[in-house]
From Swiss-Prot:
Protein's recorded name: Protoheme IX farnesyltransferase
Record organism: Azoarcus sp. (strain BH72)
Annotated GO MF terms: protoheme IX farnesyltransferase activity
Lineage: Bacteria, Pseudomonadati, Pseudomonadota, Betaproteobacteria, Rhodocyclales
UniProt keyword Transmembrane helix, yes or no: yes
Gene Ontology CC entries for this record: plasma membrane
Gene Ontology biological process terms, A to Z: heme O biosynthetic process
Remarks, miscellaneous: Carbon 2 of the heme B porphyrin ring is defined according to the Fischer nomenclature.
């Protein structure tokens, strides 16, 4: 009985380790934005629930596979950083081959679901997003250029486009505008994190902006990109994609984000950078929730 209990406990720990590899909190935001895209793609009424379910499962699986590949590729870097040294691979809880197989099976399953139950366009776009994050960003951009977040942000901005394509079978200007919002949001979001983790990134040898250009330059960049983001978020109202509910939310949230960025520039502290980073996640979630609310409660 004791042996069975220990075996069950060990199996549970390994299952949890694989779960952690998928970066579930990041994945949740990805899926959330994708699902919002699915609902916004339908002018009137609701999208087909089975298609929404299949697309959600497929996108979540491929996103989890991309996260696992990122952990696999960066395991030596993760071991040198306080923020990531407790991930399963640096701790020795899993082997590289296991993670590679896990990512392949999970990603292959997700792509198969998208192709069979959604449409080919969504499958190909999701595959391109996987390659963009796991290969282009992780292998080529992140270790080589301080603009890694800016360029690599394209893959992270894809979820609403994937959701839109899943339901409509096409990529429209409105879908690309959702892409643009997340693309503009990505630099201030990640640079806020990099500001209070500068020593970590320097220790790992990663050329994040605060490491290569200094904290002052990065804080100014956060402010400039946040102001640009504010302007971009007004476009859905300007093109009549969204109405007053969204506009009020976008202005309120945007001014708050700009206020955080301004304070970072003028009165920096690690605690403030951490709060800014956390607020940026809340900001994006509420902004997309406002898009959805406005879609069905248009004023």
């Amino acid at each position: 009985m004791k042996t069975l209990t220990l075996a069950h406990h060990g199996l549970g720990r390994r299952a949890h380790a694989f779960y952690v590899l998928t970066k579930p909190r990041v994945n949740a935001l990805i899926v959330f934005c994708a699902v919002i895209g699915m609902f916004l793609a339908v002018p009137d009424g609701l999208p087909d629930p089975l298609r929404v379910f299949a697309a959600t499962v497929g996108i979540a699986c491929v996103a989890g596979a991309a996260a696992a590949m990122n952990c696999l590729i960066e395991q030596q870097l993760d071991a040198r950083m306080a923020r990531t040294r407790n991930r399963p691979l640096p701790r020795g809880e899993l082997h590289s081959v296991e993670v590679l197989v896990f990512a392949g099976v999970l990603g292959g399953f997700g792509l198969s679901v998208l192709y069979q139950a959604v449409n080919a366009l969504t499958m190909w776009l999701t595959l391109a997003t996987f390659v963009g994050y796991a290969v282009i960003y992780t292998l080529l951009l992140k270790p080589r250029t301080p603009q890694n977040i800016v360029i690599g942000g394209a893959s992270g901005a894809m979820p609403p486009v994937l959701g839109w394509a899943a339901v409509s079978g096409e990529v429209t200007a409105e879908a690309l505008l959702l892409f643009l919002i997340i693309f503009a949001w990505t630099p201030p979001h990640f640079w806020s994190l990099a500001l209070y983790r500068t020593a970590d990134y320097a220790r790992a040898g990663l050329p994040m902006l605060p490491v290569t250009h200094g904290a002052a330059y990065t804080r100014l960049s956060v402010l400039l990109y946040t102001c640009a983001l504010f302007g971009v978020t007004l476009l859905p109202f300007a093109i009549r994609m969204s109405g007053w509910i969204y506009l009020v939310a976008a202005v309120t949230l945007g001014l708050r984000f700009v206020h955080y960025a301004w304070r970072l520039l003028r009165d920096y502290s690690d605690a403030l950078a951490r709060r800014t980073f956390r607020f940026s996640i809340v900001y994006l979630s509420l902004l997309f929730a406002a898009l959805l609310a406005d879609h069905y409660l248009r004023l």
